[in-house]
């Protein structure tokens, strides 16, 4: 690769924006860019072409010039191409008739009848050579006709005299023969009449029986059909209704059983709850009775007053007993009704059983009864269903009410139980409290008891008298009782208060007994009056207490009596209900078991019935199928029988006819028949099972072309090769009528073609299903070991193989197989070997010595009378030429060598198989291609097909099956009705005891509280009676299906009688024919007409006049169309007009002037609206054509010149020739394409030519759109898209326009690295022959480059890099025509200045091929601005943003320089390898303390996914170099750490350098941030230190001299809060832990320089 340098002005292309915004560019087309294409053409054009049109944004074409999509073809072009190669009309060819005219005239004068036949049409030929041949044939025939007419005329005169004498002799002999014949004929007529009458009677009897049979058959079939349809309909309705009823009953039963189960479970729960209640009640009762004993002692007197309660109890008891009797009566009535229902059901079932018996007896009329009962059944079923629905609704309503009542009772009982249990618990707790209180009271009352007993004795003595007086007090008792209750409450409270006071008083009393003694005397005096009052009240109390106790005793006795009766009745009811339930449960269980048995038995019955029905229906279906088949077979049998008889008769007649003609031309010498039918199999499927490759047409032609069968080593052989290969190409194209597979026949290796799906063929009475054709190439004269062949999908079209004027022999082995895959014996088959030509071909290439042969190996050859093909011992072929009469042939080839020719036997021979396999060898010599068709269509005349040998067998009629008698299913037992259980009696209610009268309080005594009375047992509501389901009505009895009468099998149709044959009539006597009078002979003659349709050919050439048909050329290439016409023949009419019209394809730029120059002899006109050019022969040209009409004349042709102007376009074209307005012909279609057609169905991977560009980093990673650091190298990879040009046929003028690739790079952002440029091909091989030149601007480029870019409509924005193919032809031959893409890698370095300003830059490229430009995609990148900052801080906290830049720092104050590095944005193009902080501080004012820290300024991510948060201490990943002598510190991040940062992550760090101010003055400081080799300066900070106000004490200065030591990586100490890591020693001798190093020598190596203020 050569390199050139050019310098000049540059123009800015950079946008200084960190986001990399793309600047829009307006494309301006200069006036200079509008130049006409005539600059590149040898002649001027009619219209200029703008080759600088902008990129086709709408079409998607990246072309910079001529981007337009090819427009649709004109309607004229489409119509012309749709009629390609079609012809209309013709030109007549005249032949002289003088000799024939004279012979006709002479015959008429001699008395011979002369008749002129219709003029014979000799057809229409296509070439003047063929016209000359036909004219010669016509002349010869005219001479032959003239000679025949002369001979006929002379013979006629001699025959007339001899005819009369012979006629007289024959008449006498014929009269005797006629008399005998008439006698025999009368006898025969009588016999014929007798036999005819007999046969007529037999036929009438047969037809009568046949008519009766068909009538009866139709009636039986209709009856069976009606019966079956009615039965099926009724049965279907019954089964649907039965299924519905059974499902409804099953659902109802399931719901009922669920309700029963739920009720049972609920009752069990209630029963368990009641049992628990009874247990608790029993316990409560025991407790109660114990308490009651004590209570009864105390209430004996009160019970006497309760006698009135007895009357109330008796009334209630009477009512209870009446209700109990009513319930028991109702239960008895329900039970009776249930038993009656069961009995009625049983009786009903018995009735149904009896009715079923009667029904079975009446089945003779079953069908009518069945239908009537079925209707009644459906009505009854509807009633039952309605009743069941009503029962269900009633049941559901009762069930709902029952469940609601049950829920209410259970809730009430639960509440009562809860209240009762709470009362018991409260009572127990209260009694325990009272018991405890009573114990205390007893202790306190021990002393008082003695006093009380003494007083009681006196009280009882006085009580008797008091009780008598208290009778009057009863009336006001109740009023007093109310007051008593109120007073009692007050007293109880007072007593409680008194007790508390008393307790205290007791304690006080024990201390003050002495004082109390005096007080007691006074108390006793006061108590005397109280005692009198008390005793009076006590007497009344005792009287009232006795009355209450008496009444309560009566109540208790009444309650106990009622309770005993209740418990007795409850036990009875519960036992009765339990017994009823057990009986019901057992009945249900028995019912379920019984119904299970019935259901199982019914299931078995249904199964047996279903099996019987299925078997019957299967047999019936089989019978009906067999009957249908029988009827069909019988009809088929009759047809076959008739066909057999007709075929036998026709066969015998045909053999007899062949016998008559066995010596005639076209017939076989002995009668033969054909047992082989193999005429057409259009739907056959062809497979090449030998594994040989099947080619498409292009592959096939390419492979044959590569084999080079005819070497083009001489001019003669070149033309011979062209003709042979054109013939080959035409013979291998796809055709809807002749589909096939293209294979090569290798020498010595069989190629097996297997045909399946054969439908129309037979062999020896067996159907042919498949066949195998095995071809083996034995020998070939070609210089190759294989030859091409077309094997057609229809095996009767067979094979078309190509010889290329050589000779070959091919063994053919054919096997036929039946439908079971068995091979069929071919013995006896007649094989057709026809169209065996000899003496045809191209004289200049094979000397008309072509010969076609067959060597038949598996049978005998039978020669056809008169055929030119004979068995010559070494094969079957024509011993002499049979192509033209001029070469000894009896017929012309076009007379016999067609499928429908009546004399096609002339080139045929027949082979008769004597063995099971078919084998023969095909061979030919000196032919271009041979079509061989193997079929059974024998060319010998009237060969009949051999009929089947045996008479067809009549079918056997099937036997109809009998319908089975189905078993009847049993009805299920009805479900027992659940009994109505007796409700439990209502327990008696205890009459509450009367309260005891208030006993007067003993004075000063605390009375024991009585026990709380036991709570009264709650009155439980009786459980409601669950609803009783109304039993479902039983399903109505299904009527039994009638036992149908079994149909009698049909009588077989009467067989047509064998009629007596008529007697053979007497043979007509053979009269000796009297000689006809000598007829006046008629001589016939005819004239001929001949026409010609001269052919036309359209050729397409490039600028080098090379054929480019069906190839591609570059856009803007010159394409020339040649409109060729064949020679015009002798005998043609005068040519008065000769016009050629060519509708040009769209996108083709026609050059009128150049076309006129290339088309002398024609007037040329152009219609721009239709893009059509017309050529009209000039008068001079017409004169040359008409100069001598008796001789063949050659024509001249015009040439169209123009350019193709579209990418990815297809240009197809043909033209029309019109001669004398009588003959017209459309030419062939030629085609040329331009590269880059998208969505081309023949080349689906095509696309527009599009150069491609990507930006990669040094590791080959694509970095398009990513941030690129200054100093980085961009490795731009450019693709030169050349694969679309593969197979290009452009001319040299297009190639010489050159091949270029332009890189339009932004020179403001990038510096070229031409030393690193690489160019490779798709295999990675280095490309040579390309020069690369750098131009500073378009103006700096040479004129040739500027002109080339202007024509391609490409304007670089500034500097550009141009790659140029040094030798366009060599470059074209090496890469373009082979379609090899090239890859250019051109590295460029981002300028350092870009890092300081930041901004985006854009880059794109162009390729220019053949003068056509194509634009690549743009590549855009951003350069981040690196802007380091410097602050002065007093703290180490990264979150503290306080900056004291510009402020005052005290002398000896410690502070920090904060160095903030530039931010590296996310998604940067390459790894970081350098990131450092270089601080050149003023050591005269600042002293480094030896301590620094590095922190993350932003969150960033490592390659392993670790996230480092902002503020993280990064000191351990750094190293420091210190030069205190010169005031220099360099802190650098380790390279391995930097490279571990993900390129998808941002990165920024900051460093704190701790300083101490050691001098007075103003000090400035700036640091340098280095990123990947590029340095960036920070801002400058300034701080001032004033003179201290108070001088410091003088100190003895201590100077420490540091010696430089080797660099040491920083190892941080554990951080301390608020302090930097110390790097000095304990005496602050300024020795940092990391090791301070004096690096004077080291910095000099690094090139560091100190900055002074």
From Swiss-Prot:
Residue positions of motif LPXTG sorting signal: 1620-1624
Report the Gene3D superfamilies cross-referenced here. 2.60.40.740, 6.10.250.2200, Major cell-surface adhesin PAc
Kindly indicate whether the keyword Magnesium belongs to this entry.
no
Q: Where are the compositionally biased (Low complexity) regions?
A: 72-86
Ag I/II A repeat positions: 150-224, 225-306, 307-388, 389-470, 471-552, 553-634
What's its membrane topology? Peptidoglycan-anchor
- UniProt signal peptide: 1-38
Repeat (P) residue spans along the chain: 960-998, 999-1037, 1038-1066
List every stretch annotated V-region (lectin-like).
629-951
- Give the residue ranges for region: Heptad repeats of Y-[EQ]-X-X-L-A-X: 206-616
Q: Give the InterPro entries listed for this entry.
A: Adh_isopep-form_adh_dom, AgI/II_N, Antigen_C, Cross-wall-target_lipo_motif, Glucan-bd_C/Surface_Ag-I/II_V, LPXTG_anchor, SA_I/II_PAC_V_sf, Surface_Ag_I_II_A_rpt
Q: Where is the composition biased (Pro residues)?
A: 982-995, 1012-1034
| Primary location class | secreted
* Record-listed Pentaglycyl murein peptidoglycan amidated threonine modification sites: 1623
Q: One matching Pfam family, short form?
A: AgI_II_C2
Give the location in the cell.
Answer: Secreted, Cell wall
Q: Where is the composition biased (Basic and acidic residues)?
A: 996-1011
Q: Where is this region: Disordered?
A: 56-93, 107-137, 975-1073
Similarity comment: family membership: Belongs to the antigen I/II family.
Q: What is this protein called?
A: Probable cell-surface antigen I/II
Query: What is the source species?
Result: Streptococcus criceti
Lineage of this protein's species? Answer: Bacteria, Bacillati, Bacillota, Bacilli, Lactobacillales
What is this protein's gene name?
paaA
């Amino acid at each position: 690769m050569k390199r050139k340098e050019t310098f000049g002005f540059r123009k800015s292309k950079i946008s200084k924006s960190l986001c990399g915004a793309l600047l829009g560019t307006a494309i301006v087309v200069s006036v200079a860019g509008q130049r006409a294409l005539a600059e590149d053409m040898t002649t001027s054009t009619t219209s200029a072409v703008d080759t600088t049109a902008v990129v086709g944004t709408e079409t998607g074409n990246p072309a910079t010039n001529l981007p337009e999509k090819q427009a649709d073809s004109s309607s004229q072009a489409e119509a012309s191409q749709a009629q390609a190669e079609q012809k209309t009309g013709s030109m007549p060819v005249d032949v002289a008739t003088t000799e024939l005219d004279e012979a006709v005239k002479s015959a008429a004068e001699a008395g011979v009848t002369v008749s002129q036949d219709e003029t014979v049409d000799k057809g229409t030929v296509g070439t003047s050579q063929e016209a000359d041949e036909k004219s010669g044939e016509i002349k010869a025939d005219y001479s032959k006709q003239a000679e025949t007419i002369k001979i006929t005329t002379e013979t006629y005169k001699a025959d007339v005299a001899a005819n009369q004498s012979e006629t007289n002799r024959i008449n006498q002999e014929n009269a005797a023969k006629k008399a005998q014949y008439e006698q025999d004929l009368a006898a025969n007529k009588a016999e014929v009449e007798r036999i005819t009458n007999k046969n007529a009677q037999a036929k009438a009897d047969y037809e009568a029986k046949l008519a009766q049979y068909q009538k009866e058959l139709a009636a039986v079939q209709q009856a069976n059909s009606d019966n079956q349809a009615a039965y099926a309909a009724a049965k279907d309705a019954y089964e649907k209704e039965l299924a519905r009823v059974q499902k409804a009953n099953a659902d109802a039963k399931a719901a009922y059983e669920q309700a029963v189960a739920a009720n049972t479970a609920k009752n069990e729960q209630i029963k368990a709850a009641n049992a628990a209640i009874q247990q608790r009640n029993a316990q409560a009762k025991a407790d109660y009775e114990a308490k009651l004993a004590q209570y009864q002692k105390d209430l004996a007197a009160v019970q006497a007053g309760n006698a009135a309660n007895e009357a109330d109890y008796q009334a209630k008891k009477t009512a209870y007993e009446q209700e109990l009797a009513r319930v028991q009566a109702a239960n008895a009535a329900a039970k009776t009704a249930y038993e009656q229902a069961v009995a009625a059901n049983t009786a009903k079932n018995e009735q149904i059983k009896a009715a079923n018996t009667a029904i079975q007896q009446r089945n003779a009329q079953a069908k009518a009864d069945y239908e009537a009962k079925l209707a009644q059944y459906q009505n009854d079923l509807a009633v039952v269903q309605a009743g069941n629905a009503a029962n269900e609704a009633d049941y559901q309503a009762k069930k709902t009410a029952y469940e609601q009542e049950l829920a209410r009772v259970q809730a009430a009982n639960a509440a009562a139980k809860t209240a009762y249990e709470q009362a018991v618990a409260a009572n127990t707790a209260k009694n325990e409290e009272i018991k405890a209180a009573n114990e205390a009271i007893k202790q306190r009352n021990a002393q008082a008891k003695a006093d009380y007993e003494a007083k009681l004795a006196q009280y009882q003595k006085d009580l008797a008298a008091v009780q008598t007086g208290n009778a009057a007090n009863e009336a006001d008792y109740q009023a007093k009782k109310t007051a008593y209750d109120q007073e009692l409450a007050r007293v109880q409270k007072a007593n409680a208060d008194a007790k508390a006071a008393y307790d205290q008083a007791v304690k006080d009393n024990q201390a003050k007994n002495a004082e109390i003694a005096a007080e007691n005397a006074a108390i006793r005096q006061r108590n005397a009056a109280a005692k009198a009052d008390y005793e009076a009240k006590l007497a009344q109390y005792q009287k009232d207490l006795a009355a209450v106790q008496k009444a309560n005793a009566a109540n208790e006795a009444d309650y106990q009596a009622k309770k005993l009766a209740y418990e007795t009745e409850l036990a009875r009811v519960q036992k009765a209900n339990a017994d009823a339930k057990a009986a019901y449960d057992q009945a249900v269980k028995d019912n379920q078991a019984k119904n299970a048995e019935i259901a199982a038995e019914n299931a078995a019955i249904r199964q047996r019935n279903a099996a019987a029905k299925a078997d019957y229906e299967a047999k019936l279906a089989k019978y009906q199928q067999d009957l249908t088949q029988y009827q069909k077979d019988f009809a088929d049998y009759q047809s076959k029988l008739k066909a057999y008889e007709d075929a036998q008769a026709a066969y015998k007649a045909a053999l007899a006819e062949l016998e008559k003609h066995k010596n005639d031309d076209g017939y076989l010498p002995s009668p033969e028949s054909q047992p082989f039918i193999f005429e057409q199999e259009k739907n056959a499927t062809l497979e090449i099972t030998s594994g040989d490759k099947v080619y498409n047409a292009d592959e096939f032609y390419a492979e044959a072309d590569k084999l080079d069968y005819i070497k083009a080593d001489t001019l003669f052989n070149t033309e011979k090769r062209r003709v042979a290969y054109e013939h080959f190409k035409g013979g291998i194209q796809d055709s809807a009528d002749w589909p096939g597979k293209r294979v090569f026949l290798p020498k010595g290796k069989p190629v097996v073609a297997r045909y399946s799906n054969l439908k129309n063929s037979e062999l020896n009475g067996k159907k042919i299903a498949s066949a195998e054709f095995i071809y083996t190439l034995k020998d070939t004269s070609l210089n190759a070991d294989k030859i091409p062949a077309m094997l057609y999908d229809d095996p009767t079209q067979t094979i078309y193989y190509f010889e290329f004027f050589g000779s070959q022999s091919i063994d053919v082995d054919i096997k036929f197989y039946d439908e079971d895959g068995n091979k069929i014996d071919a013995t006896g088959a007649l094989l057709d070997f026809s169209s065996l030509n000899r003496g045809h071909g191209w004289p200049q290439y094979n000397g008309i010595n072509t010969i076609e042969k067959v060597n038949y190996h598996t049978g005998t050859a039978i020669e056809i009378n008169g055929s030119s093909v004979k068995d010559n011992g070494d094969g079957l072929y024509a011993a002499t030429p049979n192509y033209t009469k001029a070469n000894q042939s009896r017929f012309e080839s076009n007379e016999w060598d067609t499928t429908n020719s009546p004399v096609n036997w002339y080139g045929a021979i027949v082979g008769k198989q004597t063995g099971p396999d078919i084998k023969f060898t095909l061979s030919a010599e000196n032919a271009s291609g041979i079509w061989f068709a193997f079929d059974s269509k024998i060319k010998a005349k009237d060969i009949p097909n051999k009929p089947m040998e045996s008479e067809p067998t009549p079918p056997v009629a099937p036997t109809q099956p009998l319908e089975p008698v189905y078993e009847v299913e049993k009805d299920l037992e009805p479900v027992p009705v659940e009994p109505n259980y007796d409700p439990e009696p209502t327990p008696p209610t205890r009459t509450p005891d009367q309260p005891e009268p208030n006993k007067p309080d003993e004075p000063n005594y605390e009375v024991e509280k009585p026990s709380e009375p036991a709570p009264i047992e709650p009155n439980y509501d009786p459980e409601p009676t669950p609803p009783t389901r109304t039993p479902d009505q039983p399903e109505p009895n299904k009527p039994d299906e009638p036992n149908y009468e079994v149909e009698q099998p049909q009588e077989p149709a009467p067989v047509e009688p064998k009629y007596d044959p008529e007697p053979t009539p007497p043979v007509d006597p053979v009269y000796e024919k009297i000689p006809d009078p000598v007829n006046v002979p008629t001589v016939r003659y005819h004239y001929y007409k001949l026409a010609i349709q001269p052919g036309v050919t359209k050729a397409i050439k490039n600028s080098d006049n090379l054929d480019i048909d069906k190839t591609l050329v570059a856009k803007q290439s010159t394409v020339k169309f040649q409109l060729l016409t064949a020679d015009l023949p002798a005998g043609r009419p005068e040519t008065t007009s000769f016009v050629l019209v060519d509708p040009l394809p769209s996108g083709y730029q026609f050059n009128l002037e150049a076309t006129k120059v290339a088309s002398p002899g024609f007037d040329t006109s152009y219609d721009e609206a239709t893009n059509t050019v017309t050529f009209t022969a000039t008068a001079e040209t017409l004169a040359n054509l008409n100069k001598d009409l008796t001789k063949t004349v050659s024509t001249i042709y015009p040439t169209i010149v123009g350019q193709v102007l579209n990418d990815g376009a297809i240009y197809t074209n043909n033209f029309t020739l019109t001669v004398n307005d009588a003959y017209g012909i459309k030419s062939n279609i030629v085609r040329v394409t331009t590269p880059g057609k998208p969505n081309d169905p023949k080349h689906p991977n095509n696309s527009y030519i599009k150069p491609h560009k990507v930006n990669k980093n040094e590791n080959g990673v694509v970095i398009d759109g990513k941030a690129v650091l200054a100093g980085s190298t961009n490795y731009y990879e450019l693709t030169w898209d050349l694969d679309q040009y593969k197979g290009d046929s452009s001319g040299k003028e297009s190639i010489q326009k050159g091949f270029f690739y332009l890189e339009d790079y932004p020179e403001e952002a990038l510096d070229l690295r031409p030393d690193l440029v690489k160019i490779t091909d798709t295999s990675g091989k280095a490309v040579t022959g390309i020069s690369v030149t750098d131009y500073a601007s378009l103006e700096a480029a040479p004129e040739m480059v500027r002109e080339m870019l202007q024509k391609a409509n490409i304007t670089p924005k500034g500097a550009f890099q141009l790659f140029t193919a040094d030798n366009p032809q060599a470059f074209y031959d090496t890469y373009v025509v082979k379609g090899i893409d090239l890859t250019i890698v051109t590295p460029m370095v981002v300028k350092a200045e870009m890092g300081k300003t930041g901004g985006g830059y854009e880059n794109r490229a162009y390729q220019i091929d053949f003068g056509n430009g194509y634009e690549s995609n743009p590549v855009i990148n951003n350069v981040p601005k690196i802007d380091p900052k410097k602050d002065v801080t007093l703290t180490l906290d990264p979150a503290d943003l306080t900056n004291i830049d510009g402020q005052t720092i005290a002398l000896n104050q410690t502070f920090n320089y904060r160095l903030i590095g530039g931010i590296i944005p996310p998604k940067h193009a390459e790894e970081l390898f350098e990131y450092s902080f270089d601080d050149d501080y003023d050591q005269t004012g600042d002293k480094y303390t030896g301590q620094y820290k590095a922190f993350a300024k932003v969150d960033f991510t490592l390659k392993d996914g670790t996230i480092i948060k902002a503020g993280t201490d990064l000191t351990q990943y750094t190293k420091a170099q210190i030069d205190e002598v010169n005031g220099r510190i360099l802190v650098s991040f380790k390279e391995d750490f930097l490279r571990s940062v993900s390129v998808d992550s941002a990165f920024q760090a900051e460093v704190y350098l701790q300083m101490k101010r050691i001098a007075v003055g103003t000090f400035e400081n700036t640091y340098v941030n280095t990123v990947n080799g590029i340095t960036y300066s920070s801002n400058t900070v300034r701080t001032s230190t004033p003179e201290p106000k108070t001088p410091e004490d003088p100190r003895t200065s201590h100077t420490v001299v540091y010696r430089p030591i080797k660099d040491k990586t920083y190892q941080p100490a554990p951080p301390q809060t608020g302090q930097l890591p110390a790097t000095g020693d304990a005496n602050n001798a300024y020795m940092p832990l990391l090791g301070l190093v004096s690096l004077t020598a080291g910095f000099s190596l690094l090139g560091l320089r100190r900055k002074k203020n």
